[in-house]
């Protein structure tokens, strides 16, 4: 394969990846800032759902926070290696120019060393989302009190975070795809082809994360509507039963 290197495009691509890294880290901050958790509601079932949703955002393996941190490491790894390849190609070009000038071509030819560090682990992991256990309530009044104690703002805020992360991930995917296309159009060579494959892989991860985040946004937003959806009918039911004489 012929080698064709456009140094400006390598610099531009590395700059793009730095911007994408910054955006990914902002998304991590969104995930980390959620307040949704076990204190979501006085109703045990809703509390359990709040805890599970909170863990999907900020928990361990498979959580949005873990995925975004891993993804940021991948982006930073790609940016670092693009910059190193830029320097490597540039230094070799300078070496050949000096060799022709001084008539010492053999002394200027050095083996190109692989400066790439090991690629960080990335992708998606499994997460746990246990079904809440159903617990009996002493009375309708007890159910109503527990429902009305629910902090629906926590779920609404989590839904907004998921929606924002979904939109940002979609933008990141498009930027990565464009970066790979730009590199492919202006460069030829094994190293550049490998870089384009990695960037395209990262774009696919961002696309999948965007879709997953949109689904989670819809789910957790529905969670916020449960108290308002059921409390009025429960209050009406209690009012009707209260007038029944023993």
Language model features: what each stretch is:
Residues 1-243:
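N-terminal secretion-targeting helices of virulence/extracellular proteins
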């Amino acid at each position: 394969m012929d080698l064709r290197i456009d140094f400006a495009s390598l610099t531009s691509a590395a700059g793009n990846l730095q911007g994408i890294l910054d955006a990914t880290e902002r998304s991590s901050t969104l995930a980390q800032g959620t307040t949704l958790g076990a204190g979501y509601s006085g109703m045990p079932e809703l509390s359990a759902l709040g805890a599970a949703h909170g863990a999907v955002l900020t928990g361990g393996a498979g959580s949005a926070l873990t995925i975004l941190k891993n993804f940021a490491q991948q982006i930073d790894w790609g940016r670092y290696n693009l910059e190193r390849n830029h320097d490597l190609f540039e230094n070799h070009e300078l070496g050949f120019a000096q060799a022709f000038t001084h008539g010492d071509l053999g002394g200027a030819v050095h083996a190109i060393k692989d400066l790439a560090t090991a690629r960080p682990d990335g992708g998606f992991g499994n997460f746990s989302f246990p079904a809440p256990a159903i617990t009996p309530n002493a009375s309708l009044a007890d159910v109503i009190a527990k429902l009305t104690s629910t902090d629906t703002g926590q779920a609404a805020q989590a839904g907004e975070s998921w929606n924002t992360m979904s939109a940002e991930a979609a933008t990141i995917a498009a930027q990565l795809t464009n970066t790979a296309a730009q590199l492919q159009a202006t460069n030829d060579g094994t190293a550049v082809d490998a870089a384009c494959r990695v960037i395209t892989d990262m774009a696919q991860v961002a696309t999948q994360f965007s879709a997953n985040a949109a689904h989670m946004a819809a789910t957790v937003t529905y969670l916020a509507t449960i108290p308002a959806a059921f409390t009025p009918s429960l209050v009406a039911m209690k009012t009707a039963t209260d007038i029944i004489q023993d």
